[in-house]
């Protein structure tokens, strides 16, 4: 819908005195429904301030996402024919409910047994990705990275060059080879090993030089892309980007960060050393319906980002500018990235709603554990507080 004179305006560069605002969304397959629930609430609060046309892309300098979070990022920032976001935040949850069962079709009968799943995993990825690829291309069309309505950061990993490839709005200005179609970027960052096939595509730079990408899920290097986003902004400050000229490279008190996880099964403690000591290669790759090695790498990288940012913001006494929303109490099928039954998807929706009511948690730097704050403020209240911060919204 076209914007009217009373509708909100895209946030001004931080040189106008505003905070550098970052929204970051973890990877996690179908568990992307959890952050989808959180951001729907966040956008509704912004709409209470600035009207129903308000969208998250109008308020954040950077929106970043890995894997399923990368898909959400594209949906929030890709322009429609009126140059407004293709999706509102509240439309993402129904999108997941409709399409996840087709992206991750569940086998029944003999085909759904553990043995059958194991045999299939030996012959290739668990899912062929055809429905996902077609869906993403249909929704995003030929929209390219430089066209997003705010800056985006989406990590992937190139298995040919063996290094991360970060598709960033900031980097595309100097490296046009990264100006790929959003559909190609989303398919790449979602290509989780063992679940979906690796993805290959080529792109031309402004001089006509062709570059080939051989990409898999960004979760193998940055399942929590918050720090990648902050690094991108910091590089712009060092390069004296005029949007950031009044901000010093280490002035992290000027950052406002909302980082949303997709849930973990930490509290379930489903693995232990006695169990893993008996594992061979196969067990490390797939064990009792899980993928231990992949889960460990993605979770450890996400937690290290949270630990680093918690330590940094607490040292600078700006911890109230960093909100990490995560649920470590998932169990059973709720912690799966691909069990896309109606029952499980509905449960994940409820987990997201419940997470809003849970107290804000922060890393205890003494023991590394995430602990609820003593003041009892909920994630819902914390989001409301951030929305009402004076520099967070601008109105025409």
Name each region found by the language model.
Residues 2-396:
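Conserved catalytic cores and adjacent C-terminal regulatory segments
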């Amino acid at each position: 819908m076209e914007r009217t004179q009373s509708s909100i305006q895209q946030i001004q560069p931080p040189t106008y005195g505003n905070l550098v605002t970052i929204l970051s969304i973890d990877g996690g397959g179908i568990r992307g429904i959890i952050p989808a629930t959180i951001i729907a609430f966040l956008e509704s609060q912004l709409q209470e301030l600035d009207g129903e046309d308000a969208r998250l892309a109008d308020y954040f300098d950077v929106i970043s996402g890995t894997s399923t979070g990368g898909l959400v990022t594209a949906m929030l920032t890709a322009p429609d024919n009126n140059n407004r976001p293709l999706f509102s935040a509240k439309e993402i949850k129904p999108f997941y409910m409709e399409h996840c069962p087709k992206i991750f079709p569940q086998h029944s009968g003999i085909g759904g047994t553990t043995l059958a799943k194991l045999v299939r995993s030996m012959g290739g990825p668990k899912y062929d990705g055809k429905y996902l690829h077609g869906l993403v291309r249909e929704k995003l069309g030929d929209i390219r990275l430089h066209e997003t309505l705010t800056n985006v950061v989406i990590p992937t990993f190139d298995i040919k060059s063996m290094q991360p490839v970060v598709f960033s709005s900031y980097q595309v200005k100097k490296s046009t080879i990264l100006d790929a179609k959003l559909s190609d970027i989303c398919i790449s960052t979602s290509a989780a090993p063992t679940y979906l096939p690796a993805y290959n595509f080529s792109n031309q730079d402004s001089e006509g030089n062709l570059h080939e990408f051989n990409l898999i899920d960004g979760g193998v290097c940055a399942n929590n892309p918050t720090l990648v986003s902050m690094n991108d902004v910091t590089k712009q400050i060092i390069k004296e980007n005029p949007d950031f000229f009044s901000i010093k490279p280490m002035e992290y008190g000027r950052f406002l960060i909302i980082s949303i996880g997709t849930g973990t099964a930490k509290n379930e403690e489903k693995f232990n050393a006695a169990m893993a000591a008996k594992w061979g290669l196969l067990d490390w790759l797939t064990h009792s319906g899980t993928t231990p090695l992949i889960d460990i790498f993605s979770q450890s990288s996400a937690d290290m980002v949270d630990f680093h940012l918690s330590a940094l913001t607490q040292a600078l006494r700006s911890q109230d500018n960093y909100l990490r929303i995560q649920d470590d109490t998932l169990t059973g099928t709720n912690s799966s990235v691909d069990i896309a039954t109606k029952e499980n998807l509905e449960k994940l929706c409820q987990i997201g709603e419940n997470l809003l009511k849970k107290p804000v948690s922060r890393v205890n730097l003494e023991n590394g554990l995430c602990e609820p704050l003593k003041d009892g403020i909920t994630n819902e209240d914390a989001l409301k507080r951030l929305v009402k911060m004076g520099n967070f919204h601008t109105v025409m």
